[in-house]
Each structure stands twice: as structure tokens, then as C-alpha cells.
Amino acid sequence: HEGYSSKAYKLGDGMITIGWGHAEPVSKSRYKVGEEISKIEANELLKMDLKKAADGVRRMFKQWEDEGKKVLITQDMFDSLVSIAFNAGVSGLRNSEIVKKMKMGEYEEAGELIKKFKTSNKFSGLSKRREKESKTFLSFLD
């Protein structure tokens, strides 16, 4: 959503970002600010990051299943949740009000909460991303 950057940069949140949004803590990053990578390497990082996010969302739903909770999940909902987990981390999603609403069966409310999830006026690209994720999540209402 935010685009591609061949050069590593700091976002101001203690993370270094590079490629299609791959983020690492500054203190543990293998990349230095200004260091460049190829699109091929960026694509590999994206695949790895998306797999990690998707696996985390799947584990979350598996845990709910194991607890006996029946939760509706469409492909569009899953895709939106993976996008959020990619951007904010699986733990950030797991502990969110979005997930609490889903567990209660309040899917429309969960979808609306996506719009406000970890956004600020500082990052307008993130607000646009959350709008798209919310719309995708709520597509089951159409």
C-alpha cells in the first residue's frame, strides 16, 4: 500500500523499513539507513513477511476453534487481517479490539474498527490503507 523503497529508512517508531514494508528493530536490523536492496530481494522479504503474517492469523483462528469458538471468516476478512498483521504485527492484531469484536460475532463493528487501528494524522498513507482493509473486510455485507 505504501509502495516500494530500495533504500532502508527509519520511520520514527524504532524500526528500519525497506523494500515493500519489511521492518526490523533498528537495534537488530541487518540493514543500515540508506543501504539498498534489489527488487528481487525485496520480493523475497515480502513473501517471508506475508507468510509469517498469514501463519499468525491462521494460528489465531485455530486457537479460537480449539477453544470452541465459532468465528466467521471469509477470504476477504482473512486477507484484511493478514494485511494488518503484516503492518502492525500478529501480536498487535491478536490483542486488538477488532479481534475482540470478531470473537463476540460483531463483524460489522470489527470492520469499522479497522479504519482507526493504529493510525494517526502523521501517516496519511496508513489511514488510506486502513480504509481499504476495512472495505475489504466488510465486503461480505454487500
Language-model-derived ranges and their functions:
Residues H1-D13:
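Catalytic nucleotidyl-transfer cores of nucleotide-processing enzymes
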Residues H1-Y4, I37, N43-A54, V90-D142:
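Long, amphipathic alpha-helical surface segments
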Residues Y9-G12, I73-M77:
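Extracellular/periplasmic catalytic domains that process cell-envelope and extracellular macromolecules
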Residues K10-G34:
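Substrate-binding/active-site groove segments that recognize
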Residues I18, L81-V82, A110, E133:
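Residue-level detector of buried hydrophobic side-chain packing
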Residues Y31-G68, Q75, D79-L93:
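Alpha-helical segment that forms one wall of the substrate-binding/catalytic cleft
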